[in-house]
Amino acid sequence: MAGDNRDPTKCSLFYFALGKVKLVHGLWRQAAWHKEQTLMLKFLGNDFTNPRWKTAALKNAFALLSKQRYGALPPNILCLNLTSIEEYAAAFFLLGGSLKDAVNVCLKQLGDFQLGIALARVVEQSNEGPMLQEIITNAVLPIAFQHGNRWLGSWAFWLLHRRDLAVRILLVSVLRTLEKCF
C-alpha cells in the first residue's frame, strides 16, 4: 500500500458494516507507512464478540465524538485521519455492535441520512429492518415534507409499505398528504 489512497481508515466504516474485521486487520498489516499501524493491529487483533472488546470499541467511538466537541483527544484514544472524526466514530460503533449509535452519528453529526440508510440495510441485511424503518420514519419523511420533495416522500412511503401514500404524494400536494397522514 502506498499513500493516502490506500488508507485503511477510509474504508473501515464499510468493512465493519459488512462484518469484515479481519479484512480491515489485514489492510492495517499492509499499511506500514501509517503512524497508527502498531496500535490498530493490536486493537483489531482482539475478539469483538467478547463484551470487553465491544465496550472498548464503543469507548473509542465516544472518545472520538468528544474530541470533536472539546477539541482535544487524550493520548490513549485511537485517532486516525479519516474523512471525518464522526465517520470513524461510526465505524467504531459498528465494531462495538451498536448500529443505532452509528446511524445516529450519520444522521445528527454528519447530516447524511443516505449513509445511515446504507449502513442499516447492510447490517440488518434487509429492507424492512427496525433501524431502517426508524430512519425512514424519523429522518427521511420529515426531510421530504420540509423540502416539498415528493419523490423522496414517495420512496419513503413505498419502503414503509404504504403504497397508497406513495402514490398519493406524487399526485396531491405535499401539505395535503401530511394532513391526511397525521
Regions found by a protein language model. Give the residues of each.
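Extended alpha-helical solenoid/arm regions of large eukaryotic scaffolding proteins
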Residues: 1-182
